[in-house]
Amino acid sequence: MSELPDRRLLLVHAHPDDETINNGATMARYVAEGAHVTLVTCTLGEEGEVLVPELAHLAADQSDQLGRHRIGELAAAMDELGVTDHRFLGGPGRYRDTGMIYDEQGNAAVPPDTRPDSFWQADLVTAANDLVTVIREVRPQVLVTYDEFGNYGHPDHVQAHRVATYAAALAAARSYREDLGPAWDIPKIYWTAISETAMRSSLRRLRESGDHTTFEGMDPDGPLGPMITPDRFIDCVIPADGYLDRKMNAMKAHATQITVDGPFFALSNNDGNEIFGDEFYRLVKGTAAPGSDGLEHDLFAGL
């Protein structure tokens, strides 16, 4: 690989569209600022719902071609964000989307008929080694991935967290697998987050506008569940500023998964940009370098 810019950001996500929903503005910002942004997507998203009726035949229970279609959607989204370095973990189709069910309590859970080639069933060391190779090649100063709950409990998000965390540790070990490249210790690691204050504010605006279906059942004054992060744990906020349009265009590129009348665009159209404009992060490795407001506004702060 040719010599890379001084600032290098690596993001590890489970399926196509996760990167845009969680970090689209962040990715667009750092590309625009000249940083090298690398996205690793762990599956093709083969088990996703198809929200476009004329493409319903692509679904896993029909022609099972959704994953291949989503490769194109992801490429289009990356074009919108300006990201040129995108890889699938182990190569396209190496790990299959596990799918997800909801248990009796309404929590995300692993399907009972999980396929042996699913990401959930992947050998952790094998999958981590695939990522170690990328880490040692790109040498990122910052890694972004999910928390231990995978943000909302999807098995592939949980597995992506495990793989990214293990790979970061292995990549730093000088004596581990020299054939995968020279050791590299990532200085800062962040988990994506949704701010409690931002979520409550956006929900309140939706309800006041008469929208009671977007995120149905979520009360702006009630409990929000583990996918929402208390503000005291938020370390970095990346404002959307001039990048929200790029993020929204990238979301539209994931056409089989995100509809313009769905919850993400509802939040945006009803001035709910606190969630999907500003992007929130928890620092789990490295030293924070907050500003006067007690927060970082640059993932590379202090480096």
Swiss-Prot record:
This is 1D-myo-inositol 2-acetamido-2-deoxy-alpha-D-glucopyranoside deacetylase. Its EC number is 3.5.1.103. Keywords: Hydrolase, Metal-binding, Zinc. SUPFAM superfamilies: LmbE-like. Its cofactor is Zn(2+). Catalyzes the deacetylation of 1D-myo-inositol 2-acetamido-2-deoxy-alpha-D-glucopyranoside (GlcNAc-Ins) in the mycothiol biosynthesis pathway. Zn(2+) binds at residues 15, 18, 157. One of its GO terms (biological process) is mycothiol biosynthetic process. Gene3D superfamilies: LmbE-like. It holds the Pfam family PIG-L. It catalyses: 1D-myo-inositol 2-acetamido-2-deoxy-alpha-D-glucopyranoside + H2O = 1D-myo-inositol 2-amino-2-deoxy-alpha-D-glucopyranoside + acetate. It comes from the Bacteria. Binds 1 zinc ion per subunit. InterPro entries: GlcNAc_PI_deacetylase-related, LmbE-like_dom_sf, Mycothiol_biosynthesis_MshB. It comes from Kribbella flavida (strain DSM 17836 / JCM 10339 / NBRC 14399). GO terms for molecular function: N-acetylglucosaminylinositol deacetylase activity; zinc ion binding. Belongs to the MshB deacetylase family. The keyword Zinc applies.
